[in-house]
């Protein structure tokens, strides 16, 4: 596996550096985080560069650049302080519809290319069905040639502003043998109520509770095949976990570099604190974790490009990077001292964001269970 970037990949990374240096994006991110607002202007700037088309096949007007390129771009964005967690639907969201959607659904989603606007997200989690997805209660029932959706979802990302969501529901006519199907739902339909929730971190991407009261759909609104809901979302989970891990690494690298610069400039007891051995020890441990994360992520990206990545790989990346990155940011915050916890330094935002990532997108505990099963399966 050769992880040296080719000329095209270097061009993408250079473009990211140029964009991030073009203005004071950090002030914009801090404002969006404070007000819990999606940074649309920034995402539009990325879309103008073609970042939202990185994984779209060439026959559909995309770049088909692959996951190694995506990883390089994601890492550099994060290293320079960008909230890449708001971008999760950009690289893969279009392809999901190209694989599973009807032509009408595809046309609606592909119209968002180049806009920077939020377009769709999945609605799976419920008050009584978090990690235990099989316990979901939202139902779809057929009456008089129509489909009616009833139930509630919670902690649904991006749902305050997305015009469409894909809802996982069970067939109300089959209570003894659950059939899980997804439905493409226009959020402007009658019977939908959205309640925005406050959260510790990841504040630039909304998190909502959604209730459905006899929301009327048509058969053409089915997303994918009936009864295939679980199989479809398993693939989405793996993709999301890899992206979360990339975000974790980039954020941790940014915090590490901020702390390193500070340690070389901050003078106490007559010399830079970076000369103190206890501070050097922190940076040694941070560097080990960052290097391990980077190698793990590039290996996973290479596997994804070669069709050999597994759910175990995605779980390993998600678990290790979520925890290692949080530890790096926590250590970097310790180095910064009062500047990191009492001022307006971005590291406090990073700390909040990374703590959330140990729960969202699949909890630490579920990643360990998934990985443990995957490891033992290799030796059967």
Curated annotation (Swiss-Prot):
Keywords: Cytoplasm, FAD, Flavoprotein, Oxidoreductase
Described function: Catalyzes the reduction of crotonobetainyl-CoA to gamma-butyrobetainyl-CoA.
Protein family membership: Belongs to the acyl-CoA dehydrogenase family.
UniProt-listed Gene3D superfamilies: Acyl-CoA dehydrogenase/oxidase, N-terminal domain (1.10.540.10), Butyryl-CoA Dehydrogenase, subunit A, domain 2 (2.40.110.10), Butyryl-CoA Dehydrogenase, subunit A, domain 3 (1.20.140.10)
Subunit structure, interactors included: Homotetramer.
Entry keyword annotation includes Amino-acid biosynthesis: no
EC number: 1.3.8.13
CDD domains referenced in this protein's UniProt entry, alphabetically: ACAD (cd00567)
Source species taxonomy: Bacteria, Pseudomonadati, Pseudomonadota, Gammaproteobacteria, Enterobacterales
Cofactor(s) the record lists: FAD
Record-given protein name: Crotonobetainyl-CoA reductase
Cellular component aspect of the GO annotation: cytoplasm
Residues annotated as transmembrane: none
HAMAP family recorded: CaiA
Main location: cytoplasm
Superkingdom of origin organism: Bacteria
NCBIfam families hit by this protein: PRK03354.1
């Amino acid at each position: 596996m050769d992880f040296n970037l080719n000329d095209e990949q270097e061009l993408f990374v250079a473009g990211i550096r140029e964009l991030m240096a073009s203005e004071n994006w950090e002030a914009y991110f801090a404002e969006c985080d404070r007000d819990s607002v999606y940074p649309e202007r920034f995402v539009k700037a990325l879309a103008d560069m073609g970042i939202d088309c990185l994984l779209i096949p060439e026959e559909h007007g995309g770049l088909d650049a692959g996951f190694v390129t995506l990883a390089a771009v994601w890492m550099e964005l994060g290293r320079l302080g960008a909230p890449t967690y708001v971008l999760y639907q950009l690289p893969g969201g279009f392809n999901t519809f190209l694989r599973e959607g009807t032509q009408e659904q595809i046309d609606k989603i592909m119209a968002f290319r180049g806009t920077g606007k939020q377009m769709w997200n999945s609605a799976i989690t419920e008050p009584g069905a978090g990690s235990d997805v099989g316990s979901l209660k939202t139902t779809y029932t057929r009456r008089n040639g129509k489909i009616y959706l009833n139930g509630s979802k919670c902690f649904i990302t991006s749902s305050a502003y997305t015009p469409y969501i894909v809802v996982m529901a069970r067939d109300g006519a089959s209570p003894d043998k659950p059939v899980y199907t997804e439905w493409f739902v226009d959020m402007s339909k009658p019977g939908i109520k959205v309640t925005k929730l406050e959260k510790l971190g990841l504040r630039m991407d909304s998190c909502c509770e959604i209730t459905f009261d006899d929301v009327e759909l048509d058969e053409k609104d089915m997303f994918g095949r009936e009864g295939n809901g679980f199989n479809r979302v398993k693939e989405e989970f793996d993709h999301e976990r890899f992206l979360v891990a990339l975000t974790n690494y980039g954020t941790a690298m940014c915090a590490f570099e901020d702390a390193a610069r500070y340690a070389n400039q901050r003078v106490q007891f007559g010399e830079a604190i970076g000369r103190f051995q206890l501070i050097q020890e922190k940076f040694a441990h941070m560097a080990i974790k960052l290097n391990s994360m980077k190698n793990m992520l590039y290996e996973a990206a290479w596997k994804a490009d070669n069709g050999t990545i597994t759910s175990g790989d995605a779980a390993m990346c998600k678990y290790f990077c979520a925890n290692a990155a949080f530890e790096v940011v926590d250590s970097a915050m310790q180095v910064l001292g009062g500047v990191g916890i009492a001022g307006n330094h971005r590291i406090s935002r990073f700390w909040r964001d990374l703590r959330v990532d140990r729960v969202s997108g699949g909890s630490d505990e579920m990643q360990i269970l998934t990985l443990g099963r995957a490891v033992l399966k290799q030796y059967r």
